[in-house]
Design a protein with these regions (language model features):
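Flexible coil/turn residues that form the inter-helical turn or adjacent wing/linker of helix-turn-helix
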Residues: 2
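Residues that mark the N-terminal boundary/hinge immediately upstream of a DNA-recognition element
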Residues: 5-6
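Feature marking well-ordered beta-strand scaffolds used for ligand recognition
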Residues: 9-25, 31-441
Length: 441
């Protein structure tokens, strides 16, 4: 790859994807959501089946183990287990709850164990008149209703298909965990809130003794330790770790409006910052999912769209050259879906990326991405400077709104995707259950 100036590329990308680009994009997309059938529409992806997850359609992160799917919920305070031995007919077989007002929406499966995020059901404890309040305020300033909940990391034995038996719980005083990364092994990398901090920070957990997990380190951006008197982060911006993904002795972390960091984690008890880059401004922020492609020394980083009807402009997924980890450089963005006007209702833009977990579909050339309102997108990134969309699937509009927050549009909220090595996908939507799809590439 030729040498590229980070500042130059940010300026170029900002010019290409600014307000003028949004206007031109909107004019070029004409099809409406009303013409999407129940099985969705797409290219290169076949619809296999649909499940309302036993009447709990608010699905978020998906894990797969021993022919069973484990799905965390956004609003239902629990985890549903589905028998996926026949992908054409998913069968709910069990439901775990950590208790009322405890959200367990994110989880990680490896080595016949399931690690589950436990934290405040934030939606039930906030008082905003629209969704943007959650994304534009620190977590501690968002909570206006005090309720009892469980905060910390629960560990479950899932060696018996269809069951999850809790074998350990690590309490984390605060509002709890948002998301975590654990592909197996000794250490889990957790995004958690602790009392005294403004929002979720990095917490490294040692699992050497699985029944006695132990916190060995914490790391945060300057300004997040309110109890220590650190100067406040910018008002109207949310600096918070969404999550970290590791590759070897490097950790890649997304901090919402706080940008993107790369860490040396060769000593998990002492993670060291190598670089910190933030493209907001000029972009809208919401940096959400950091997917390293270590063999190619690239990272794919998705910014989560978080405003109704594109009120903040378009959000993007960036391709970064990380050959020099002390100086990551944005070199491209994944193409924005254009076959219809996705800005007319609800939120439109990137959400998650399939994370190349061990045992799942793994590729540094084919990227699976989920989009609010625009379903699943598959990209060819063999030319990192010119990614191409090679397949897509768009879901129908949900029949009803599950999200209890006010002023939320009735639109698809395609959330997460787990892709098996054979290309079979389990795709969640926090309003509309789960679709099973088959990638045909």
């Amino acid at each position: 790859m030729p040498q590229v100036s980070r500042r130059r590329h940010l300026q170029q990308l900002s010019g290409v994807f600014g307000a003028a680009a949004l206007s031109a994009w909107s004019r070029s997309a004409s099809a409406s959501e009303a013409d999407i059938p129940p099985e969705g529409i797409g290219k290169g992806i076949q619809h296999i089946s649909y499940s309302d997850i036993g009447g709990r359609p608010d699905s978020v992160q998906v894990m797969f183990n021993r022919q069973h799917v484990y799905v965390g919920h956004m609003f239902s305070d629990g985890v549903t287990i589905l028998d996926a031995s026949d992908p054409r007919a998913l069968k709910p077989v069990n439901f775990f709850t950590a208790g009322q007002n405890t959200r367990t929406h994110h989880l990680q499966a490896a080595e016949d164990l399931l690690l589950v995020a436990n934290g405040a059901n934030i939606v039930a404890m906030q008082s905003y008149d629209n969704m943007r309040g959650y994304f534009e305020n620190t977590l501690v300033d968002s909570i206006t209703k005090t309720k009892k909940f469980r905060s910390g990391l629960s560990i479950h034995d899932i060696s018996k298909p269809g069951e999850m038996r809790e074998i350990a719980f690590l309490e984390m005083p605060g509002f709890g965990i948002n998301r975590l990364w654990w592909p197996g092994g000794r250490y889990a990398y957790v995004s958690a809130h602790f009392d005294g901090f403004t929002d979720h920070i990095l917490c490294v957990v040692d699992l050497k003794t699985i029944t006695k997990p132990e916190i060995v380190s914490k790391w945060w951006l300057p300004g997040m330790n309110r109890a220590a008197g650190e100067p406040a982060t910018p008002k109207g911006k949310r600096f918070a770790l969404h999550h970290m993904i590791t590759a070897g002795d490097r950790g890649y972390a997304a901090w919402r409006d706080g940008g993107f960091t790369i860490h040396d984690i060769s000593d998990p008890a002492n993670p060291k910052l190598l670089s910190h880059i933030n493209w907001s401004p000029p972009f809208a922020g919401g940096t959400h999912t950091p997917l390293p492609l270590p063999k190619r020394q690239l990272a794919i980083v998705a910014d989560e769209a978080n405003a109704e009807k594109c009120a903040k402009g378009l959000f993007h997924t960036f391709v970064l050259d990380v050959r020099a980890p002390e100086n990551p450089v944005p070199i491209a963005t994944l193409p924005t879906p254009r076959e219809r006007d996705f800005c007319t209702n609800g939120t439109f833009g990137p959400h998650n990326l399939h994370e190349n977990r061990p045992g799942s579909f793994q590729s540094e050339e084919t990227i699976f991405a989920t989009y609010n309102n625009a379903g699943v997108r598959v990209f060819d990134v063999r030319d990192a400077f010119a990614p191409k969309e090679i397949a897509y699937w768009v879901p129908p509009v949900p029949k009803k709104l599950v999200d209890p927050r006010p002023n939320i549009g009735l639109a698809a909220k395609t959330c997460d995707a787990y892709v098996r090595p054979d290309g079979l996908m389990f795709v969640s939507d926090w309003n509309a259950g789960m679709h099973v799809l088959q990638y045909q590439g």
